[in-house]
Amino acid sequence: MRTKNNFAYIDGANLHKGAESLDWKFDYKRFRIWLREKYGVEQAYLFLGFVPKYKDLYTRLQEYGYTLVFKEVIFDGEGKAKGNCDADIVVRAMQDTYENKFTKAILVSSDGDFSPLVKFLISKNKIEVILSPYETKKCSVLLKRTGVKIAYIAEQQSILEHKKH
């Protein structure tokens, strides 16, 4: 851990879907600890759509140390929930940057829609790393083109895999 007071901005839907694509069970509690120990993350914002039936999960995530930022969910034509949190992540990260609330940002997403945010954070010397929930070939080329270091969650199985007790 090099610096402290780093903030993580986590695209909850992207992390969830990326974790589901792994051939091992992702552990959110271990992930929060790892963010603190490896990247000095003091504040981990987890952005997600609010679905009432998952309230027990939300409670557990808060107990693990995440700050949950909810977005109202809308449902598409097939009944799939959509949280659409991208703009919320961008606004929070930019606001925190302008208010100088953190040393470095860690972005957890594979979504190329965040490349303008990454470029902004580069211009302010405020980005540490992008943590991609998806493997390298599924991580957006737009993020790769920013030149920011990208680490792949799939490569951290020994640390982040849920262990049966």
Pin down the residues of each PLM region.
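Terminal and domain-boundary accessory regions
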Residues: M1-H165
